[in-house]
Amino acid sequence: MIYQMQMPTKIDVDEATHTGSFGRFIAQPLERGYGVTLGNAMRRVLLASLPGTAITGIKIDGVFHEFSTIDGVREDVPEIVLNLKKVRFKSNCKRSCKTTLTLAGPKDFLAGDIVAQEGEFEVLNKDLHIATINSEATVTIDIYIGRGRGYVPAEENRSDGMPIGFIAIDSIYTPIKNVKLTVENTRVGQKTDYEKMILDVETDGSITPDDAISLAGKIINDHITFFANFSPTEEEFSEEEYKQLDDEFESMRKLLQTKIEDLDLSVRSHNCLRLAEIDSLGDLVSRREEELLNYKNFGKKSLTELKEQLEKFNLKFGMDITRYQLKG
C-alpha cells in the first residue's frame, strides 16, 4: 500500500501582480522537501527548455567577417551583433526565415525596423537601438531568424549552405527572462511542517506566464511518465517466442537501414532530406517533427508526405532506435 502523500489542492495566481509578462504562482500544501524538488525542476525547464524565436545570423553587403567596420555606421559589426542578440520576437513560425532590410541614413536603426516580409514574426522590443547610420550611408542587411530552445552558440548556427559573408550569432531562444523560486512553511490543520512553493515567472512577452508554466509542467510530466510506467518484472518467454522476438528485431533493424532514395518520395522531399544528411529510415524516424520543420525549404507538405510513408511501415517520428545499434 502506498502512503497517501499531501498534494496541492490547486495552483493559486497572485492577481494583484499578474500581467502578460509576469506571474506569481503558488502551490500548497506540499510534503517537506517537495517545494525545492518540484520548484527546481520547474525553474530549470522554464529557463532552458521552452521554445522561442531568435536571430541566428546576418549578412551585410560589403562586410565579409564579423570584425569589420561599416562605412557611415557609428557602431562596428561586433557591437551591432551584440545589439541584435537582444531582439525579442513573437512568432508562430515553425521554421527559419529571412528578411532583408535596406536602411538609408540619417537614421537610428531600431529593432522595430526588422519587419517580416510575410508576417512570420513580430518584434516585441521595437525601441531597442541597433545602430546609427549617417546621412550619406545606405546599408543592406539580411537577417536570418530561427526557432529553437534555450541557448545555441554561434558555432552551431554555421552551416555549409550559408552565403559568403554570413555572420553567425549566438541565439537566445528562451522566452523566459527570469524565474524566482521561494519555499515557505505552511499549515494543514495542526501540522506546520508542510511547504508552500512560490514561482515568480517573468517572460519576454512572446508567451504568457500561464502558458509557460503549463508547458513546463507538460515537459516534466512527459519525462516522468517513463518512470511511472516502468516495471522491473521480466517476462518469461518460450524458446519459440524468443526466436520470434529475434526475427522481429532483425526485421525492424533491416527496415531501419532502408535508404531514403529507395522510398517513393517527391524530388523536393528527397532534396530536403539529402541536405539535412538524413540517409536512411533510421535517420528519419529518430528525428522529431519540429526538427524537420527547422530545416531549410522543409514545409508541412513534405512533412505530411513523410508521415504517410512512415505509416506504411508502422513507424513514426521521434522513435528511440538506439537498441538496434545502427551504424552511422
Curated annotation (Swiss-Prot):
**Annotated region (Alpha N-terminal domain (alpha-NTD)), positions in chain:** 1-231
Q: Which organism is it from?
A: Chlorobaculum tepidum (strain ATCC 49652 / DSM 12025 / NBRC 103806 / TLS)
Q: Name one GO molecular function term.
A: DNA binding
Carries keyword Transcription regulation?
no
Q: Name one GO biological process term.
A: DNA-templated transcription
Which catalysed reactions does the entry list for this protein? RNA(n) + a ribonucleoside 5'-triphosphate = RNA(n+1) + diphosphate
Per the record, the similarity remark reads: Belongs to the RNA polymerase alpha chain family.
Source domain of life: Bacteria
Q: What is this protein called?
A: DNA-directed RNA polymerase subunit alpha
Q: Name one GO cellular component term.
A: cytoplasm
Q: Where is this region: Alpha C-terminal domain (alpha-CTD)?
A: 247-328
Family matches, as InterPro entries: DNA-dir_RNA_pol_insert, DNA-dir_RNA_pol_RpoA/D/Rpb3, DNA-dir_RpoA, RBP11-like, RNAP_asu_C, RNApol_insert_sf
- Enzyme class, broadest EC rank: transferase
Q: Which UniProt keywords apply?
A: DNA-directed RNA polymerase, Nucleotidyltransferase, Transcription, Transferase
Domains: entry comment: The N-terminal domain is essential for RNAP assembly and basal transcription, whereas the C-terminal domain is involved in interaction with transcriptional regulators and with upstream promoter elements.
Whether Transcription counts among this entry's keywords is yes
Q: How does it assemble?
A: Homodimer. The RNAP catalytic core consists of 2 alpha, 1 beta, 1 beta' and 1 omega subunit. When a sigma factor is associated with the core the holoenzyme is formed, which can initiate transcription.
Which Pfam families does the record match to this protein?
RNA_pol_A_bac, RNA_pol_A_CTD, RNA_pol_L
Task: Identify the EC number(s).
Answer: 2.7.7.6
Could you tell me what this protein does?
Answer: DNA-dependent RNA polymerase catalyzes the transcription of DNA into RNA using the four ribonucleoside triphosphates as substrates.
Q: Which HAMAP family match?
A: RNApol_bact_RpoA (MF_00059)
